[in-house]
């Protein structure tokens, strides 16, 4: 298990927000918008290597979309200057559930993850996310006392506590890449692991 530190830097040109006009009387929506606006005003400075596994929180989902906390695997190396990373969610195997063998791929146990079970990669739920989602809960916890007016006054950068990250084995990552090839019907693609 390794640790990474995230450096978040205030954007040079702050975003203009209609979120913070206090017209919305619902405190939950208001707090959610405040958190979203806070994240949007920072860019992350961290390199993510492919096959790295993180735990993130998916926001509200519709129907069968994922929601809540899940482990995800980064599908490509994302340089410090790139704000996005493409991920595939992982889920634990449920004995009673029948899986689509083309879109839900068995990858076994991911070493290092606490209370780990046999895992599957949900290839049909591949998505691209902003890197702040990898560290977002910790960012919010770090600044829970900060009010919106103070956010605008804040200058410079902040460090967020270390975050545990894990890695898939080369074999596990190859299984996922093969599954993507088959799922998208693109055939074999020349690729390298690290």
Write out the residue ranges for each language-model feature.
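Loop/turn positions that initiate beta-strands
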Residues: 50-53
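C-terminal terminal-subdomain/extension
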Residues: 1-33, 98-194
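Short, surface-exposed secondary-structure edge patches
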Residues: 43-47, 63
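Short, surface-exposed secondary-structure boundary micro-motifs
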Residues: 58-59
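Compact nucleic-acid interaction/catalytic patches
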Residues: 64-112
């Amino acid at each position: 298990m390794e640790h990474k530190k995230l450096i978040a830097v205030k954007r040079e040109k702050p975003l203009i927000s209609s979120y913070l006009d206090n017209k919305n009387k619902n405190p939950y929506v208001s707090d959610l918008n405040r958190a979203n606006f806070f994240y949007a005003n920072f860019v992350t400075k961290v390199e993510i290597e492919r096959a790295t596994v993180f735990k993130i929180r998916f926001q509200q989902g519709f129907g069968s979309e994922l929601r809540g906390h899940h482990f995800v695997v980064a599908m490509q190396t994302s340089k410090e200057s790139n704000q996005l990373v493409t991920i595939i969610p992982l889920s634990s195997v449920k004995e009673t559930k029948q899986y689509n063998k083309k879109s839900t791929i068995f990858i076994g146990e991911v070493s290092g993850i606490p209370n780990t079970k046999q895992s599957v990669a949900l290839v049909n739920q591949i998505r691209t996310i902003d890197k702040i989602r990898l560290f977002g809960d910790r960012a919010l916890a770090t600044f829970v006392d900060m009010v919106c007016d103070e956010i605008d006054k804040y200058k410079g950068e902040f460090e967020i506590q270390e975050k545990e990250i894990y890695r898939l084995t080369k074999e596990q990552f190859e299984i996922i890449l093969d599954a993507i090839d088959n799922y998208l019907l693109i055939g074999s693609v020349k690729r390298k692991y690290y």
